[in-house]
Amino acid sequence: MVYRIKVAGVERDLPLCPINEELNIGAFVLFGDVELTCKCAEELYKMAPEHDVMITSESKGIPLIFEMARQMGVSKYIVARKMQKLYMSDIFSCDVNSITTAKKQTLYLDGKDAEFMRAATSTVSILLLLARLVMDT
């Protein structure tokens, strides 16, 4: 079973994945899909409010945030990691729940990234924008 979707002018058939007995979701995967990634980034760039910082979790949002930063001429974006890394210091963490992950996850930011965010006047979450783009299409 598949669910046909049209996002940013690009059509794809998404395989349906069961979440529980009553709910299936279409697996929207950007990894490896250059056309879809570039088109979504272009549309999200148009939708994004004015911001100083872009952030995503260590997820399928990484190629998207990279492409958005490239198109916008931005030299930095932040990725909240799923595991602490040896190079991180003064780590900031928060617990999150995801529809595609059965249990609670913890995301981690290096202290320098957390400071960069604190200094910003506005931040945009790429994954929230992507959800809005998909729902509006």
Question: Residue spans of the language-model regions?
Answer:
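Active-site-facing substrate-recognition patch
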Residues: M1-H51
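Structured loop/turn residues at beta-strand edges in well-structured enzyme cores
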Residues: P49, M72, R118
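Short glycine-rich phosphate-binding loop at a beta-alpha junction
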Residues: H51-E58
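Gly/Ser/Thr-rich loops at beta-strand to alpha-helix junctions
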Residues: E58-L64, V134-D136
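Beta-hairpin (beta-strand-turn-beta-strand) motif
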Residues: S59, K82-M83, L127
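Short Gly/Thr/Asp-enriched flexible loops that form oxyanion-binding sites at enzyme active sites
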Residues: L64-G73
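Short, glycine/charge-rich flexible loops or terminal/linker lids adjacent to PRPP-binding catalytic cores
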Residues: S75-S122
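Cationic, amphipathic, low-complexity alpha-helical segments enriched
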Residues: T121-T137
